[in-house]
């Protein structure tokens, strides 16, 4: 196992050797019933240091409901480990296109859903302020958010690699 991957998993409290591959996590997973998410396989791939574990789209299918973690007979924090693997994946440049697009929107306008003229008009018709109480309404707050995102290097993480 690569030193970096092992460090990430240890930080999540995941003792990869304690997993007995019983399948309780996968069998309990609500998302796994409808998608390609197989938590047991992801843990196994991480344990075997398979290069594909970070680029696997299934890593992003977890909804973080924590069912797998609650039911694991060994008490392995599986969801936390998946989140750590996601963080490492992003640092290594593996980000789903739709996540990258949302990141770009947040960097650009401070919100994942930009406010267009049609939405402003509909809000006015409903008797609402055309611009809701978000950073989009306050230019100085938007600039502060952009500065904060730059300081924490979010722009670099979101950039295409």
Swiss-Prot record:
GO terms for cellular component: cytoplasm; plasma membrane. Its main location: cytoplasm. GO terms for biological process: methanogenesis. [4Fe-4S] cluster 1 binds at residues 19, 22, 25, 72. It catalyses: coenzyme B + coenzyme M + 2 oxidized [2Fe-2S]-[ferredoxin] = coenzyme M-coenzyme B heterodisulfide + 2 reduced [2Fe-2S]-[ferredoxin] + 2 H(+). Its EC number is 1.8.7.3. Keywords: 4Fe-4S, Cytoplasm, Iron, Iron-sulfur, Metal-binding, Methanogenesis, Oxidoreductase, Repeat. Pathway: Cofactor metabolism; coenzyme M-coenzyme B heterodisulfide reduction; coenzyme B and coenzyme M from coenzyme M-coenzyme B heterodisulfide: step 1/1. Residues 10-40, 51-82 form the 4Fe-4S ferredoxin-type domain. It is found in: Cytoplasm. [4Fe-4S] cluster 2 binds at residues 29, 62, 65, 68. Part of a complex that catalyzes the reversible reduction of CoM-S-S-CoB to the thiol-coenzymes H-S-CoM (coenzyme M) and H-S-CoB (coenzyme B). This is Ferredoxin:CoB-CoM heterodisulfide reductase subunit C. It comes from Methanosarcina mazei (strain ATCC BAA-159 / DSM 3647 / Goe1 / Go1 / JCM 11833 / OCM 88) (Methanosarcina frisia). The gene is hdrC.
């Amino acid at each position: 196992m690569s030193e970096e991957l092992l460090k990430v998993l240890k930080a999540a409290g995941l003792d990869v050797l304690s997993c007995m591959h019983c399948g309780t996590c996968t069998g309990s997973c609500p998302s796994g019933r409808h998608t390609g998410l197989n938590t047991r396989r992801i843990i196994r791939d991480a344990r075997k240091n398979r290069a594909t574990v970070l680029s696997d789209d299934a890593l992003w299918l977890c909804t973080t409901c924590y069912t797998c973690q609650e039911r694991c007979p060994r008490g392995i924090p599986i969801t936390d480990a998946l989140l750590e693997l996601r963080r490492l994946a992003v640092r290594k440049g593996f980000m789903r296109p739709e996540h990258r697009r949302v990141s770009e929107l947040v960097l650009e306008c401070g919100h994942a859903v930009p406010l267009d003229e049609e939405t402003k008009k509909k809000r006015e018709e409903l008797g609402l302020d055309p611009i809701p109480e978000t950073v989009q309404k306050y230019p100085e707050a938007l600039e502060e958010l952009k500065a904060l995102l730059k300081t924490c290097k979010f722009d670099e993480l979101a950039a295409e690699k």
